[in-house]
A protein has these predicted regions:
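A short acidic, amphipathic alpha-helical/loop segment
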Residues: 40-42, 64-67, 95-98
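Bacterial Sec signal peptide processing site at the extreme N-terminus
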Residues: 6-26
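Outer-membrane beta-barrel transmembrane domain signature
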Residues: 15, 20, 89-175
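Transmembrane beta-strand segments that form the barrel wall of outer-membrane beta-barrel proteins
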Residues: 23-34, 46-60, 65-89, 113-128, ...
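Sec-dependent N-terminal signal peptides
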Residues: 1-5
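Beta-strand-rich domains and repeat architectures in extracellular enzymes and scaffolds
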Residues: 35-39
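Outer-membrane beta-barrel "beta-signal"
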Residues: 8-9, 65-70, 166-175
């Protein structure tokens, strides 16, 4: 079981579910099933549409660098962003993720409104743990509650390892 998990793991940048501000730096920790050990991250706003991120994991697994760019704003509550990332892990990868964010209409007094998002990710692993290349595509959903807590769930599928039509087939034989 651990071998199956280890062969499939990769690392992804944590999303900062707010619009960037020039010169503002945010810091936090992310916990994931992929990395086991928490990863510390930093995000710095370059302007009102772009920020750059750095992640540091021990032992380097989960580390990486990424850049976010807001592509569209739809009023004060919705925006679309593109994230480009390089990740260091057993399956080091290049990621491209398209996010659609939506901020709640109102928040509790004195708190930040919650933000939810859906994302579409493409990932290229040039030299994975199994010594092969991999192209994965997936979908993810996330939500931030207030300023400190949030979650993200997703699925990335490697079409070379299993046909998409066989995901729910419990009798599928990879031979």
């Amino acid at each position: 079981m651990v071998m199956l998990w280890g062969c499939g793991c990769a690392s992804h940048p944590p999303v900062l579910a707010k619009e960037p501000r020039k010169g503002e730096t945010d810091m936090g920790f992310s916990f994931s099933a992929e990395n086991v050990i928490p990863v510390i991250w930093f995000r710095r706003g370059l302007n009102r549409s772009t920020d750059i991120g750095l992640r540091i994991g021990l032992p380097l697994s989960g580390s990486g660098i990424d850049v976010n760019r807001i592509l569209f704003r739809n009023g004060s509550r919705k925006w679309d962003a593109l994230n480009l990332a390089y990740n260091v892990s057993p399956n080091s990868s290049f990621d491209l993720t398209y996010y659609k964010f939506k901020k709640a209409k109102k928040a509790k007094r004195g708190e930040m409104p919650s933000v939810s998002w859906i994302g579409f990710r493409g990932m290229f692993i040039p030299y994975g743990i199994s010594k092969n290349q991999s192209q994965r595509f997936g979908i993810l959903y996330g939500r931030r509650f207030g300023k400190r807590y949030g979650f993200e769930l997703g699925y990335n599928h490697d079409f070379r390892s299993m046909p998409l039509s066989q995901i729910v087939n419990l009798n599928w034989d990879p031979k």
